[in-house]
Amino acid sequence: MHRAVDPPGARSAREAFALGGLSCAGAWSSCPPHPPPRSSWLPGGRCSASVGQPPLSAPLPPSHGSSSGHPNKPYYAPGTPTPRPLHGKLESLHGCVQALLREPAQPGLWEQLGQLYESEHDSEEAVCCYHRALRYGGSFAELGPRIGRLQQAQLWNFHAGSCQHRAKVLPPLEQVWNLLHLEHKRNYGAKRGGPPVKRSAEPPVVQPMPPAALSGPSGEEGLSPGGKRRRGCSSEQAGLPPGLPLPPPPPPPPPPPPPPPPPPPPLPGLAISPPFQLTKPGLWNTLHGDAWGPERKGSAPPERQEQRHSMPHSYPYPAPAYSAHPPSHRLVPNTPLGPGPRPPGAESHGCLPATRPPGSDLRESRVQRSRMDSSVSPAASTACVPYAPSRPPGLPGTSSSSSSSSSSNNTGLRGVEPSPGIPGADHYQNPALEISPHQARLGPSAHSSRKPFLTAPAATPHLSLPPGTPSSPPPPCPRLLRPPPPPAWMKGSACRAAREDGEILGELFFGAEGPPRPPPPPLPHRDGFLGPPNPRFSVGTQDSHNPPIPPTTTSSSSSSNSHSSSPTGPVPFPPPSYLARSIDPLPRPSSPTLSPQDPPLPPLTLALPPAPPSSCHQNTSGSFRRSESPRPRVSFPKTPEVGQGPPPGPVSKAPQPVPPGVGELPARGPRLFDFPPTPLEDQFEEPAEFKILPDGLANIMKMLDESIRKEEEQQQQQEAGVAPPPPLKEPFASLQPPFPSDTAPATTTAAPTTATTTTTTTTTTTQEEEKKPPPALPPPPPLAKFPPPPQPQPPPPPPASPASLLKSLASVLEGQKYCYRGTGAAVSTRPGSVPATQYSPSPASGATAPPPTSVAPSAQGSPKPSVSSSSQFSTSGGPWAREHRAGEEPAPGPVTPAQLPPPLPLPPARSESEVLEEISRACETLVERVGRSAINPVDTADPVDSGTEPQPPPAQAKEESGGVAVAAAGPGSGKRRQKEHRRHRRACRDSVGRRPREGRAKAKAKAPKEKSRRVLGNLDLQSEEIQGREKARPDVGGVSKVKTPTAPAPPPAPAPAAQPTPPSAPVPGKKTREEAPGPPGVSRADMLKLRSLSEGPPKELKIRLIKVESGDKETFIASEVEERRLRMADLTISHCAADVMRASKNAKVKGKFRESYLSPAQSVKPKINTEEKLPREKLNPPTPSIYLESKRDAFSPVLLQFCTDPRNPITVIRGLAGSLRLNLGLFSTKTLVEASGEHTVEVRTQVQQPSDENWDLTGTRQIWPCESSRSHTTIAKYAQYQASSFQESLQEERESEDEESEEPDSTTGTSPSSAPDPKNHHIIKFGTNIDLSDAKRWKPQLQELLKLPAFMRVTSTGNMLSHVGHTILGMNTVQLYMKVPGSRTPGHQENNNFCSVNINIGPGDCEWFAVHEHYWETISAFCDRHGVDYLTGSWWPILDDLYASNIPVYRFVQRPGDLVWINAGTVHWVQATGWCNNIAWNVGPLTAYQYQLALERYEWNEVKNVKSIVPMIHVSWNVARTVKISDPDLFKMIKFCLLQSMKHCQVQRESLVRAGKKIAYQGRVKDEPAYYCNECDVEVFNILFVTSENGSRNTYLVHCEGCARRRSAGLQGVVVLEQYRTEELAQAYDAFTLAPASTSR
């Protein structure tokens, strides 16, 4: 069933609008899909493509061609006889590609390739090649214009349809690349059947694999016998909601040949723009506005579809498809498709561009303004499905891994053409060749753009693969690197709007529909495969009461949320080539019997990047924490997180280090909230704005670095015979586990104390484990800054030096900035469900020792959870706990049920002193260990380091765990922790002496104990009270040397208890207490019990580290330098955003936050003495005026200064039209009628009176009210009235002259009013508010106005109204007034006190009256006394009243060609004295006076419940982001406004979080208007309270918090949306600084 599409249409600010019309399939429509083989689709309820899909912009809809190179070129597989003319060009093409395969960095060859394709009119390929040439140093001056011309040609071709069916002469570069690469691999000489002997060349560290890798054919397709064909997903697959379990893949094909050489890196600009991929046959890419056509849905036989279903993807990355080719058949509305595939039912429907009745607030405004880019036809831009579809709860595995994994690209997409035997390359003929529409829809913005808060998981691949499915993707053809899309698209601006509103709200309002679906059948426990998945709580959009769904949902949801984290965040990139190459060649599982008949392999639920499992509707802050994640970069956990292939990592036939995720896979089961490692997390330098490393922490780092250098120098001098410890970075490459994308860098930097010895451990372990069939697991994160581990087993490292130990601590501390990036983490893994040893490179992880979990479970089998399990719980309440319990799955492999500790309640957050005590104890332990190592080097080879140390008794392990295991041991751990806290405080007071450790062994037992204590305990730096004090307890009694470097060391902000905590990272080779169950990211050290942080920036904490040396011992005492807490009332603009967040976070505000946005100390109003009685002549002052004699005068800066001088309320500029040669005839009545005679005119019917009088109807007294009635007509009809009144006036004049009439003032032929009126007033009609905003209809008129000086123009950088972001009729557009004598514009101030420009077109004159803004309150009082509303009423001042009140009135005549500048806040009223036309618009010059008055009126309007037409808070933030302000007064005002706005948002947010109300992130899109409360018309900035009108699913209304709470005190039925992440506002606030005066204007 397809919900009818409502026609798009304009809306008034208060009108509701239909959201339903924006959905292609309807978020709530029941879409009976075609069930894929062996699986049943849920009945329609939730199978729409709405929630969870990222808005995909489609500036250039491609055509549905079947060639991988060109949409309209027949598809020729390698080896297929293809008609290839121009053999010379082909030879040249092959030669270039062969040379580039050897060395991609040859701009000349890339340019040559581009010229080849350009000569054959293949602009897409040419643009790609030119981009590559630029990437490798080509001349931008030469290539830039060429690229622009080609892209423009593509655009024109799309509109003209000229190249829709043009066959290409040259084969696509991708085909050639892959073909030659296959030959290259055949010559590579590697044996099939095992991992490659030799690792291919290292790619550049910072260069991720080109997006081609995303969709590159996995080895199983490109190289395996059954895979040499394009295997796309049918439309059914495309319809599979994201994250559903997949049917089991077929038996894995034989291992592929060795990996290819690294592909050329992507274009440099792609780090922040989505990777682009060529259009595939049938590919539904972001530019297809088209849903799959019915003819394409069922065209493939079921068996072929089943094959495609079962063919797993080997690559977890989405391939955002991008094509610049026009659609060959039809343009379909640009459905904002997202990570989630659309259900089959939805596939067949496109959004028809019907007209929508006027609608309101949220969605239509977004959608109407997200008409995509101008290059898209209206049909193509009709936004469909503003929200991605919610995943059906509990849907059994129904589709192939390819369809289910939103980000795993159909590897067939790239390069490997279908076998010649496959009939019909045309995608309509052979849907088997289609790429998964789902994947194809994962366009660039699918990952770069934000997703709705509750997106159905989709972007993360959940492909479950036979754990070892080997595949070796060919090097991605550079062709896949599409040129960056238009900026609007890159930002997901226009297209995001389409999907981000309705369905997400529908989800929140109406919950998930449809009967619960049973979880996928458990997979029989078999070696090398994941254990049977238990249903777990869905992280999709359904309510918390919905049935559990397969674990896949969690990871996908997390992934989708992680995408949404950054509106501007980088888009997902492929992993570095060495990771990508090693994905496939992993050992295959020992169970090749898995067939399509087997129950679906439970999809690996990959780590939730601390993204909120935002679908659970529990009222907790944790669920939407992700919306504030300060790390937009993690917006792409589309990394090797997919379990489709073994995690990428160096694997070779010869013994060599293998990433822990590879070797120890058998010990690992599917984890509920594992973190998908983000390959680019380390690949690219993190944007400075997100390096939330506080200054204090940075200082600690510096101090530690200095100490490290000193220690290294000393050690090198003292131990000349001992080699210095190897750099910590090298072991990291091999040991780095797949860590949560949010915290991957943390583990990368957080080197455990034994980092120097872990290389050996890992090597041996992984070698042994290499032979075991690992289950499909997320690969370890790429280590951008670290080379892959060395191939030969490294020799045992030398004794650890103080330098290396301090480096470890530094790493721990530095890791905090990365941990902070995981702010909204809803990272919860099933506690105790699977031991974390699979990523701990100790042999105990499956090969030589039983996998240790925690000390208690492994040694005694006791159910106590390990340390890491304690961090796996979210304290956010029931739904999370249910999710953990439901998501637990036993891990296969050596893990026995006895070893799986049951989940326990969340331990209380650690205290500040505990945290700091841990740091000091860690430093101390490090130094002690170093001392022992130097004295007794044999210790370095102790069992701990080698990873073979027997497990200590549980009690000992508990002691050694730094108190964390104890704290996590059971429900009573909270009390024990509190006791420990008190002890630590006492110890801190002592500062030197005893070690208040519960059950700690005496100093005699120190040696064995400290072996495990080297792990540094659990530096729970992310705990709730992370910023607490840290007072250490030194071991030494006598202090010989004390160094007191004081360093501000603010660890990242505390994590509220309501947030789930990321897992801790056990140190490899340590005792079992570190190897407690944890997510796959748990790998290096238990040092980091990562807790998700609150949204605000970290609190700065100054820590003084005191180094105490006594004999051979060195102790660090860490003590907090107390800082005064900042109160919210003490905040000033000098404080940074972190201070603002911290001060306002815990502020308790009673009632509504009502602080002013203006500081009273910043007024710039002129001083006007109102007490002095002015003489009569001064009550009629001369009007400031300027006569322009030349164009030079008009553009003089003096004119701007004069007009905007606060002392001049109004300025008349004479002769402007003549000096600028304005053609005012364009605005004459005759021209207007010719241009658009049927244009609407608002008519005001008035009584004609003298300009300085205003009589009542009886004509007996003057009054203030000036009433008029409103009606409408057209320009043509009013022109007739205007002309006839002029003729009648002329005739009356003649008659009056002849008869000496006593009524000389009668100038109209209409009958006089019948009311008793001695003056015999006449009725006149005033044509007003004629909108000239249509740039096409009024193009000549609007272009003529561009001749004006910049500050007077309708649009300019210095005009605040140009930064509103949307149209305000009459303010930032031109309006026309058609007048007859007596037409009155009653008294008023401009909207929000903005300036105004008015030009008299003529031929008659107008008389103006004006009063300075200073007197508006007096005039308002007059209006009140006369019973008329000052702000909204119609009044005409009595001049005598004003004079009596000592108010001077400026009075002057505006002649044709004169321009009147009405300064900010000026009260004015106008009457026409002749027949004339006027044009007018508003201007907001960036002056302090204008800004102050605008904000004053903004606040006054709120008091009077009047709508502020200009959304000043929204405008202020936009100005702060885009304009350099050099005026100090203006800068202070704007900064203060931003400060108040941040405080308001934070206070409001914290109150909602405390109340347990979810806040859903929904980023803004281009041209999205500001929102106003539907009831009180106040601007609603950032945090929107949305309700469904009358329970309707199609209409949503925005409210302010006050009105929302009046409707429902507990906000039941109200969805809270957040449009800006806290980090976005903080970044903009801090970046807004005073610019040098020289750059002013």
Curated annotation (Swiss-Prot):
Residues where Zn(2+) binds: 1573, 1576, 1600, 1603
Residue ranges with Low complexity bias: 214-223, 312-326, 396-415, 552-568, 743-766, 855-879, 1306-1317
Expression induction: By inflammatory stimuli; mediated by NF-kappa-B.
Region (Disordered): 42-89, 188-682, 704-808, 824-1085, 1286-1323
SMART domains, per the entry: JmjC
Annotated EC: 1.14.11.68
Cofactor(s) required for function per UniProt: L-ascorbate; Fe(2+)
GO cellular component annotations of the record: nucleoplasm; nucleus
Compartment(s): Nucleus
Binding site for Fe cation: 1388, 1390, 1468
Reactions listed under catalytic activity: N(6),N(6),N(6)-trimethyl-L-lysyl(27)-[histone H3] + 2 2-oxoglutarate + 2 O2 = N(6)-methyl-L-lysyl(27)-[histone H3] + 2 formaldehyde + 2 succinate + 2 CO2
GO molecular function: beta-catenin binding; chromatin binding; histone H3K27me2/H3K27me3 demethylase activity; metal ion binding; sequence-specific DNA binding
Biased composition (Basic residues): 974-987, 1002-1014
Compositionally biased intervals (Acidic residues): 1294-1305
Gene Ontology biological-process entries: cardiac muscle cell differentiation; cell fate commitment; cellular response to hydrogen peroxide; chromatin remodeling; endothelial cell differentiation; hippocampus development; inflammatory response to antigenic stimulus; mesodermal cell differentiation
Tagged with keyword Metal-binding: yes
Modified residues (Phosphoserine): 224
Any Pfam family the entry gives: JmjC
Function per UniProt: Histone demethylase that specifically demethylates 'Lys-27' of histone H3, thereby playing a central role in histone code. Demethylates trimethylated and dimethylated H3 'Lys-27'. Plays a central role in regulation of posterior development, by regulating HOX gene expression. Involved in inflammatory response by participating in macrophage differentiation in case of inflammation by regulating gene expression and macrophage differentiation.
Protein name in UniProt: Lysine-specific demethylase 6B
Source organism of this protein record: Mus musculus
Record lineage: Eukaryota, Metazoa, Chordata, Craniata, Vertebrata
